[in-house]
């Protein structure tokens, strides 16, 4: 009965052009009320409050703050200069610089969003100016920023460690080698694509 009601409510909401996320939320709330009454609201509030009181979660806003401070202080440009000295001489150097800088920035901020915000506004226009296609520049920037999920200190790793009751330190150690390997293969792919297209 509950499943049939959920399905019907979702179809009705979607047919009257309610956004999918809101439709799913309303459907879920109706199903919870049908199944348990309104007591789930109190339980949900308690669980959310208890979940927010975990000590490792304090690191998340601090990593975001550190990334914001570094961006406003101009550290992004210094990281780009350092990466340029390391890999800028290779064919497709600007895409290599993009990937290396994203890896360095991921090691500092732990956030893929902060990585894209700090480096994308600098590197994408620079890559376009050097003749890289805009889609390629955006793809390199976004894919290299996704390494921040793997390279420690990673915000998703902290959240996972809290939820799974795992060791944050062990997860960070486990992310080093895959992050470096992922960065290497991204650089290899960027090099091959640069040979073909640029």
What do the PLM-derived regions correspond to, one by one?
Residues 1-196:
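Alpha-helical transmembrane segments of multi-pass membrane transport proteins
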């Amino acid at each position: 009965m509950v499943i049939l009601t959920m399905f019907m409510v979702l179809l009705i909401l979607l047919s009257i052009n309610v956004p999918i996320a809101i439709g799913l939320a309303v459907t879920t709330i109706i199903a919870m009320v049908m199944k348990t009454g309104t007591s789930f609201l109190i339980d949900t509030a308690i669980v959310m409050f208890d979940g927010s009181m975990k000590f490792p979660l304090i690191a998340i806003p601090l990593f975001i703050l550190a990334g914001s401070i570094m961006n406003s202080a101009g550290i992004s440009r210094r990281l780009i200069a350092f990466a340029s000295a390391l890999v800028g001489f290779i064919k497709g150097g600007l895409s290599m610089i993009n990937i290396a800088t994203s890896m360095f920035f991921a090691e500092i901020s732990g956030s893929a969003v902060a990585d894209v915000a700090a480096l994308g506004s600098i590197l994408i226009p620079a890559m376009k100016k050097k003749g890289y296609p805009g889609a390629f520049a955006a793809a390199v920037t976004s894919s290299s920023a996704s390494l921040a999920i793997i390279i420690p200190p990673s915000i998703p790793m902290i959240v996972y460690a809290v939820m799974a009751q795992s060791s944050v330190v062990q997860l960070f150690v486990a992310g080093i080698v895959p992050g470096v390997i992922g960065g290497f293969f991204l650089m290899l792919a960027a090099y091959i694509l640069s040979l073909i297209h640029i």
